[in-house]
């Protein structure tokens, strides 16, 4: 998605998460108005790039995405010459973006993470115990489905507060997508997600291991997370103000080691912060604009 050209334009290449695709056009509009040229990428086997014969979202090697990210950046460079590139990633896309930045030093002007999946929910202790087990399973049965659990609250919350059977907080417009529901193509973003193959999870945990042991980037990082996690079965107001997928405390802790210049920002919002209530979204956009102006612009 391309924006208008401005003096000191900042280039953004946005990477979505698992069970996801780019539809956050409000975020793109806000950043274009702030002077950024915004581009988004649906990675292979996701969203607009998904083909009928493909297994949605599947890979056993996260570096495979280097190809399309690299091609996208080359295309941006052809149009935007030497303007700074800021890579942004949400959830799994945040992990992929971080690893790409690690493998390509000197390319990025900055990295923005929106609930970036930098570590398993129980930190490296759980990963260290589980990785050998998952590795053995993946070697024998790559597509074996790992039980993933989860409450399904996040997908349900995206249908909006109006259908939630909960009280709608004062001040929220009935027309706002956080109330009316986000316009989602369910073929590309499924309410209950889809199976987790063992070989895919092995690749994710290998990425987490690299982040923990090897990643130290040469660019500033903005890591945005929710103020709280909520993983209980009860359907309540907290599903709209918490991360119901990942642990934001773990993400923030892991983010601190990504670079010498790391900004942590917390918001009372959902797993994808730009799909939260309108006041939270405005705070997220303001934080990104301020950070870009301070460290990139």
Task: Give, region by region, the residue ranges found by the protein language model.
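The conserved SAM/SAH-binding core of class I Rossmann-like methyltransferase domains
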Residues: 39-41, 114, 265
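Short, surface-exposed "cap/lid" segments of acyl-processing enzymes
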Residues: 2-43, 50-52, 238
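Short beta-to-alpha linker loops that shape the active-site pocket of alpha/beta-hydrolase fold enzymes
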Residues: 18, 42-47, 117, 268-270
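Serine-hydrolase catalytic core
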Residues: 148-261
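Alpha/beta-hydrolase-fold enzymes
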Residues: 92, 96-195
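Catalytic nucleophile-loop/oxyanion-hole region of alpha/beta-hydrolase
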Residues: 19, 47-80, 84, 281-284
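Catalytic active-site module of serine/aspartate enzymes centered on a nucleophile-bearing elbow/loop
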Residues: 261-297
């Amino acid at each position: 998605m391309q924006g208008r050209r401005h003096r000191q334009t900042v280039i953004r290449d946005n990477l979505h998460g698992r069970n996801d695709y780019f539809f956050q056009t409000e975020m793109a509009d806000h950043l274009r108005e702030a002077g950024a040229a915004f581009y988004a990428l649906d990675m292979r086997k996701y969203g607009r790039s998904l083909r009928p014969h493909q297994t949605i979202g599947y890979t056993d090697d996260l570096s495979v995405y280097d190809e399309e990210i690299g091609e996208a950046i080359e295309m941006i460079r052809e149009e935007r010459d030497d303007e700074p590139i800021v890579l942004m990633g949400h959830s799994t896309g945040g992990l992929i973006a971080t690893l790409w930045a690690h493998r390509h030093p000197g390319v990025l002007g900055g990295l923005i993470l929106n609930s970036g999946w930098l570590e398993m929910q129980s930190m490296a202790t759980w990963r260290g115990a589980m990785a050998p087990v998952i590795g053995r399973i993946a070697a024998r049965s790559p597509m074996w489905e790992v039980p993933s659990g989860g409450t399904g609250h996040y997908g349900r919350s995206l249908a909006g507060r109006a259908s939630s059977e909960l009280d709608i907080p004062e001040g929220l417009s009935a027309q706002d997508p956080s109330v009316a529901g986000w316009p989602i193509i369910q073929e590309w973003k499924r309410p209950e997600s889809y199976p987790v193959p063992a070989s895919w999870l092995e690749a994710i945990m290998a990425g987490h291991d690299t982040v923990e042991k090897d990643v130290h980037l040469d660019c500033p990082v903005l890591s945005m997370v929710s103020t709280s996690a909520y993983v209980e079965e009860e359907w309540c107001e907290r599903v709209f103000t918490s991360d119901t997928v990942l642990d934001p405390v773990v993400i923030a802790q892991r983010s601190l080691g990504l670079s010498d210049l790391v900004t942590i920002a917390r918001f009372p919002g959902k797993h994808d912060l730009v799909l939260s209530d309108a006041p939270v979204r405005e705070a997220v956009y303001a934080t990104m604009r301020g950070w870009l102006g301070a460290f990139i612009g």
